[in-house]
A protein has these predicted regions:
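Conserved NTP-donor binding/palm subdomain of two-metal-ion nucleotidyltransferases/polymerases, i.e.
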Residues: 1-118, 124-361
């Protein structure tokens, strides 16, 4: 991509910005369009154009492709929020044992049509995973995955291995038959990492959970600072794990957009509290990682957050370039230091060099 194409991509993704450089629209190429869809930012991009009154100022095919995705998101979210309410009813007397994550809350916070979700993620205390799972099973959910548009049940081995090695269960799925959502998928997480070893932290977050109320929706979710830290931890887990790099799913922009949204809405005092909470939980480096990468990929109007993150990692410059392979316990380092160049690379795996084992990291 050309420099101008990259700038247009960045501007279209930065939906919280109050200004937009119209000169960038001449770079509205199929290349930019492809990157928007690849990074699941197509609806957000249309929302940005609409916000600035520029939907009619860009190539028609470019705009119409984004508009279709935007309108589809609005339709899908109607069904998604129906599913959030339905799940809340199933778990109505389990309030102190879980919190809904990511899309269940964020889809209501984003501008309309700019974000949707394919599933509902739950954070559950490890000792309550079986109870929550039983509630879902009693409501008609089955464990498995969607393959080629159809449900495929998980084997007992897959169910056990997921709980033992991934810190999450095999998804619980039910066919709900809504116009824009045929299946409802619920993912139960009981760890912030692939290894189910941070149970104390998970329990503390759930004990501090809050209920966010909207006009037509109540969502039990994590407290704002813990919600931010969970997003950062989830992003870090995927961005620094070799299989995700190999699949080119390690730096998908929509994940950074969530952090961009929360940081854009936070003033300095609120940002300081986020980092203070991260230090309490021992996740300050992970949060710094997410903030630094987000500040490079979006036009983030929170200079304090970026500066604070840089300060946290100043003595560990390799932290933001480290990738691990859980299978063979190897450690890798990105040879390309520029985050934006890594993001737009066609194959990030070739930018890695082996750097010892995890035990020696």
């Amino acid at each position: 991509m050309t420099k101008k194409e990259k700038e247009l991509f960045k501007s279209l993704c930065s939906f919280k910005e109050n200004t937009f450089d119209k000169k960038l629209l001449s770079a509205a190429t199929p290349n930019v369009l492809g990157h928007l869809f690849f990074n699941r930012m197509q609806a957000t991009a249309y929302g940005t154009l609409k916000k600035h009154g520029l939907a009619g100022a860009v190539n028609r095919e470019f705009a119409n492709s984004l508009k279709a995705a935007y309108e589809r998101n609005i339709e899908k979210n109607r069904d998604f929020f129906t599913c959030v309410r339905y799940l809340g009813e199933i778990l109505s007397d389990c309030g102190d044992k879980y919190a809904m994550l990511k899309g269940a809350y964020l889809c209501r916070v984003y501008p309309e049509g700019c974000r949707t979700s394919n599933d509902i993620d739950l954070l559950v205390k490890p000792e309550d995973v079986t109870e929550i799972g039983n509630r879902l099973s009693s409501a008609g959910f089955k464990q498995g995955n969607i393959r080629n548009g159809e449900f495929k049940a998980a084997s007992r081995r897959e169910i056990i291995e997921s709980k033992m090695t991934r810190g999450e269960t095999v998804p619980y799925i039910k066919e709900v038959g809504l116009p824009a959502m045929r299946f409802l998928e619920v993912d139960i997480n009981f760890s912030l990492d692939y290894k189910p070893g941070d149970t104390g932290l998970v329990c503390e977050m759930i004990n501090n959970a809050v209920t966010e109320e909207f006009d037509d929706l109540r969502v039990r979710t994590l407290r704002r600072d813990d919600f931010f830290i969970h997003l950062c931890s989830h992003l870090y887990k995927e961005a620094t794990t070799l299989p995700w790099v190999e699949m080119m799913r390690d730096m998908t922009a929509y994940k950074y957009a969530d952090i961009y949204l929360l940081l854009s809405d936070a003033d300095r005092e609120q940002t300081e509290r986020l980092f203070e909470r991260a230090r309490e939980l021992g996740t300050e480096k992970i949060c710094a990682f997410a903030v630094i990468e987000t500040s490079r990929l979006f036009k983030l109007d929170n200079s304090y957050a970026a500066a604070a993150a840089e300060e946290i990692l100043k003595d560990d410059p390799e932290f933001i370039r480290t990738v691990i392979s859980p299978n063979d316990k190897k450690k890798y380092i990105f040879t390309e230091k520029d985050i934006v160049k890594r993001f737009f690379a066609k194959n990030r795996k070739v930018l890695l060099k082996e750097a010892g084992s995890i035990e020696n990291a």
